[in-house]
Amino acid sequence: MSPNQNCFFIVEFVPDGKGVPHFFDKDWIPDLPDYSFYDFPPCGDKFSSHYSLKAKTSNLSGDYFIEDDLASMDMCVLCDKLNVKFIRIPVEVELYRGRTPNKKYFLFFLKSYLSILDEERSIYSKSTDLKNENFNVSGEDERFFYDSIELFKVKDSVSENLFFCNELMLPVCSAVFKEECERLGLEGVGFKPLDDNYKYSAWDDLDLS
């Protein structure tokens, strides 16, 4: 079975309020540089070779804090095993009362940015630039932004195990990656099937009330 015959999954953050807190304040030493990862991965040259993080929580055991760009050693080892392209920078974490977590952590950025939507087989609507009535595009690759996707069919050529999906602006993984995460018991990581039941709307997370 080829990799693409398996379902792909959106990788989600699943907090438990304990070792995987919903949110915690962070003090970085030195300060992190300004960066955006929505169009392309951040430039590694902007970062220090290592960081210290004062995490304002009493416990930290999650393996992939997606919003914080923080991953455990176990997550990085799995990515190495599955040939995932990523940037890692060592982070020394200090918790409340000077405690240290049991796991080692790294700043973590995916390097593979893939457009995986098969437009011929999918059902979708693209966003428009209201200023000039043209499709809103970004950069030399002319990446479109999507208002909605009613049917998401993945291109047959997709074979990577973990990458940043350009259409959804989210991390997406293969079934192989999902199975390995579950086998290893990685904490704070969930998966939403990118199958025929999946629907996307750019307005879902906006409060328009």
Give the positions of each predicted feature.
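Intrinsically disordered, low-complexity boundary segments flanking structured domains
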Residues: 1, 51-53, 72-77, 91-97, ...
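Short, extreme N-terminal segment that most often corresponds to the first beta-strand
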Residues: 1-29
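Acidic, proline/glycine-rich low-complexity IDRs
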Residues: 2-8, 102-104, 109-209
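Short N-terminal edge-element motif at the start of the domain
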Residues: 19-70
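A generic structural motif
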Residues: 39, 89-94, 191-198
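N-terminal start-of-chain detector that recognizes signal peptides
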Residues: 39-43, 58-62, 77-83, 135-136, ...
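Aromatic- and glycine-enriched beta-alpha-beta binding-site module
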Residues: 62-116
